[in-house]
């Protein structure tokens, strides 16, 4: 039953333009039902966002795939994720690169995600309880940064932690949000607009 649901989801993602086979295999390998509350397990492979508590959500699989594909990852990419949340996006990244650094401002979510990743034998992830606006400077610079909540503007600290040639993908805006791709080239930041999106806000500070 689960396999059929995964196959249906993968077919939908392909129809929506997701082409990276490494990425699709990672999505197939990560059991999304392990990252949602038991009450929502029957919806785990629907192409929709789901609540995970603390006012946060697990993103729609299409958006996880779209943002990940836009990062143009290689196995040696150094990756920073802002907003660990349930840990689902983190798990997808962990299947694609050697190591992932992930920051979560809500301590309870960080702890739960860390436990889920360990249960799935994904040990190539470092998680940190902290302010996503500040990134993780001591682990940078990064080849790829993915932000899974929307700041009103691109955080300066994240731009500074993006390595030359690196790519950052994030939603930007308050009421109206746009998915943007930021590339660092010759010390300049080139910003590309992708599509309109809807994410929870990237809140400053950290929460116990």
UniProtKB/Swiss-Prot annotation:
The active site is at 59. InterPro entries: PCMT, SAM-dependent_MTases_sf. Keywords: Cytoplasm, Methyltransferase, S-adenosyl-L-methionine, Transferase. It is found in: Cytoplasm. It is an enzyme of class 2 (transferase). PROSITE patterns: PCMT. It catalyses: [protein]-L-isoaspartate + S-adenosyl-L-methionine = [protein]-L-isoaspartate alpha-methyl ester + S-adenosyl-L-homocysteine. One of its GO terms (biological process) is protein repair. One of its GO terms (molecular function) is protein-L-isoaspartate (D-aspartate) O-methyltransferase activity. Belongs to the methyltransferase superfamily. L-isoaspartyl/D-aspartyl protein methyltransferase family. NCBIfam families: pimt (TIGR00080), PRK00312.1 (NF001453). HAMAP family: PIMT (MF_00090). This is Protein-L-isoaspartate O-methyltransferase. It comes from Pectobacterium carotovorum subsp. carotovorum (strain PC1).
């Amino acid at each position: 039953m689960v396999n059929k649901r995964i196959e249906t989801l993968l077919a939908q993602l392909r129809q929506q333009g997701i082409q990276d086979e490494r990425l699709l295999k990672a999505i197939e390998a990560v059991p999304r039902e392990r990252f949602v509350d038991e009450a929502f397990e029957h919806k785990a492979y629907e192409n929709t966002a789901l609540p995970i508590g603390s006012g946060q959500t697990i993103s729609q699989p299409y958006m996880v795939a779209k943002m990940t594909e836009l990062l143009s990852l290689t196995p040696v990419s150094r990756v920073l994720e802002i907003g660990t949340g349930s840990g689902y996006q983190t798990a997808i990244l962990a299947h694609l690169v050697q190591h992932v650094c992930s920051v979560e401002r809500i301590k309870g979510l960080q702890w739960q995600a860390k436990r889920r990743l360990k249960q799935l034998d994904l040990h190539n992830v470092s998680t940190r309880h902290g302010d996503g606006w500040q990134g993780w400077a001591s682990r940078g610079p990064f080849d790829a940064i993915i932000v899974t909540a929307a700041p009103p503007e691109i955080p300066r600290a994240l731009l500074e932690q993006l390595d030359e040639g690196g790519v950052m993908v994030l939603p930007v805006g308050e009421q109206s949000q746009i998915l943007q791709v930021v590339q660092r080239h010759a010390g300049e930041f080139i910003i590309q607009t992708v599509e309109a999106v809807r994410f929870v806000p990237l809140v400053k500070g950290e929460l116990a």
